[in-house]
């Protein structure tokens, strides 16, 4: 017997017998009814434990609509509509913010009806009328269309706020920290201020303002909705960028020989020049790793170069999917989070083996047993991998700096700028913010995957390596991004610098609180590695507990930000 909620995948829970007969008869042979009416849908709450505290994944029965209390009273009441996936709504009164129970994904019209029910019930329950409605910025979200119509009907203002900023504010509000903080907001997708897809962001934030001060390296997400499920597309796109970049630089830098020939055994570098044999072939990498056929690669490359069915993205979620595909763990996801969670499980298996090796070594030392020849072999192999990585990373960063300094136009960068200009109010130049070089990390993992033949042991070690290095990249970028941001501000406003500006710069540079948020931080391994590294670097780390880090927490961030932005604007 399987007992679960009564609903189709992606649809809200069925509330009455008539709907159950219509929608659920194909799912079961018998429908057991009851004469007690269901007034309010209530999904099961789902949570994990992190440092002996709840870490919410889905906030619903037993937790919603318990409020989040802020220290400051607000004069306005807010209705926040949330995002598109894992939707919730939040209503506010004074200093209390009430997130609703889980509504679900709004791709199904039945979920829109459930959203309307939830809004009506929350407003009635707390006897409030909103002064303002707030929603996401994405122009094609059903939640945005719903909010626009509702604001028009209620004749009240509508405020649209950036997705990842609201993730950060949600984490701040739950922890009672008004900022400023440095937010690390990693998720699958969100509409960026520059018209591209964001998802791997470093954000300077307060309750009422934000600046994007860093991100993972932008990449072309080719294939529309398919690319959200098919990680191999993201990996192939990164290989295309690698080929274009080294081809553009020509003979000005040394590149690892294995980038030219994945089968090469030597560790020596070779000079890259304009001859074909010294330019890496992304297609060779993609086919050797079993990501796609030559034909699929060529079709995708043509689409990318033409900018067809292509968006520019900094999605951290898609990077996890790509690495999972590169390692042969999941070429594509069968369900949400499939590739990323499988990658995490592989990484955890390797970490457990490292821990066991440490334990065996400790027991061996306690018994004065010196015959354990294999003791420490995993650690030795991993240290060798880290040594190779450091060498590769320095070489590839030098290549990128050389490209920038010489003003060489790389084809993929041209595509990025063109797509930005077509879709955005402004062009957010990636060269003016801190970049987390996930592209270099994926290139290295691809090389190592080819070298180890995607063996089970190799997959596990490289899975852990990915989590380990990404967390270290985040630490480095959090430390570096404020400085780069201040340098950018000083350059832009050099003719207007005064004492107030200098004090603001000092405040930005002195921030020592980091918020880890977004659905990617449901990955407990990444969250722990990043949190521990930031703490060792002297940062206070705030994370979620009773509010989900995923899009289920967005509406809280929207409501808190909207109330403070509204109040600040009316004080001016």
Please report, for each region that a protein language model flagged, where it lies by residue:
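Conserved phosphate/anionic-ligand binding catalytic regions in large, soluble enzymes, centered on
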Residues: 2, 6-8, 12, 187-197, ...
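Short beta-alpha connecting loops at secondary-structure transitions
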Residues: 211-225, 304-308, 539-545
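Active-site-adjacent structural elements in enzyme catalytic cores
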Residues: 1-134, 138-150, 196
């Amino acid at each position: 017997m399987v007992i679960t909620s009564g609903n189709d995948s992606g649809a809200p829970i069925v509330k009455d017998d008539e709907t159950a007969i219509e929608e659920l008869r194909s799912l079961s042979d018998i429908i057991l009814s009851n004469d007690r009416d269901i007034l309010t849908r209530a999904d099961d709450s789902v949570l994990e434990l992190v440092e002996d505290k709840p870490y919410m994944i889905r906030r619903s029965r037993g937790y919603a609509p318990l409020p989040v209390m802020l220290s400051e009273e607000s004069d306005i009441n807010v209705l926040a509509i949330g995002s598109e996936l894992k939707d919730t709504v939040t209503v506010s009164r004074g200093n209390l913010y009430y997130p609703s129970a889980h509504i679900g994904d709004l791709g199904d019209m039945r979920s829109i009806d459930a959203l309307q029910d939830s809004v009506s019930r929350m407003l009635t329950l707390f006897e409030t009328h909103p002064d303002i409605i707030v929603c996401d910025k994405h122009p094609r979200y059903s939640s945005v269309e719903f909010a626009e119509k509702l604001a028009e009907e209620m004749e009240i203002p509508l405020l649209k706020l950036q997705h990842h900023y609201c993730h950060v504010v949600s984490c701040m509000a739950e922890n009672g920290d008004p900022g400023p903080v440095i937010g690390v907001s990693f998720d699958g997708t969100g509409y960026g201020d520059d018209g591209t897809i964001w998802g791997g962001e470093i954000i300077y934030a307060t309750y009422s303002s934000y600046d994007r001060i860093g991100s993972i390296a932008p990449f072309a997400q080719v294939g529309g909705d398919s690319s959200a499920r098919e990680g191999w597309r993201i990996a192939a796109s990164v290989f295309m960028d690698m080929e274009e970049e080294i081809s553009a630089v020509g003979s000005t830098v040394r590149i690892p020989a294995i980038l030219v020939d994945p089968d090469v055994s030597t560790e020596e570098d070779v000079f890259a020049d304009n001859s074909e044999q010294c330019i890496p072939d992304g297609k060779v990498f993609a086919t050797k790793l079993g990501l796609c056929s030559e034909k699929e690669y060529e079709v995708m490359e043509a689409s990318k170069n033409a900018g067809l069915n292509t968006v520019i993205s900094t999605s951290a979620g898609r990077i996890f999917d790509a690495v999972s595909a590169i390692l042969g763990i999941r070429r594509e996801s069968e369900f949400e989070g499939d590739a990323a969670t499988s990658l995490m499980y592989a990484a955890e298996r390797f970490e457990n083996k490292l821990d066991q090796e440490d334990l065996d070594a400790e027991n061996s030392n306690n018994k004065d047993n010196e015959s354990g020849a294999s003791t420490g072999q995993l650690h030795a192999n991993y240290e060798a991998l880290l040594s190779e990585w450091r060498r590769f990373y320095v070489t590839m960063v030098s290549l990128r700096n050389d490209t920038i300094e010489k003003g060489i136009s790389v084809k993929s960068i041209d595509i990025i700028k063109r797509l930005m200009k077509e879709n955005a109010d402004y062009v957010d130049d990636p060269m003016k913010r801190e970049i987390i070089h996930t592209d270099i990390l994926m290139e290295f993992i691809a090389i190592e995957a080819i070298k180890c033949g995607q063996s089970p042991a190799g997959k596990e070690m490289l899975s852990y390596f990915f989590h380990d290095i990404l967390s270290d990249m985040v630490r480095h970028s959090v430390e570096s991004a404020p400085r780069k941001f201040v340098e950018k501000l000083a350059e832009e406003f050099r003719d207007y610098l005064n004492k107030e500006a200098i004090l603001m710069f000092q405040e930005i540079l002195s921030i020592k609180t980091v918020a880890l948020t977004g659905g990617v931080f449901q990955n407990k391994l990444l969250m722990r590695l990043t949190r521990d590294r930031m703490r060792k670097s002297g940062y206070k780390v705030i994370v979620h507990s009773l509010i989900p880090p995923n899009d289920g927490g967005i509406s809280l961030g929207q409501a808190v930000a909207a109330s403070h932005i509204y109040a600040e604007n009316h004080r001016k």
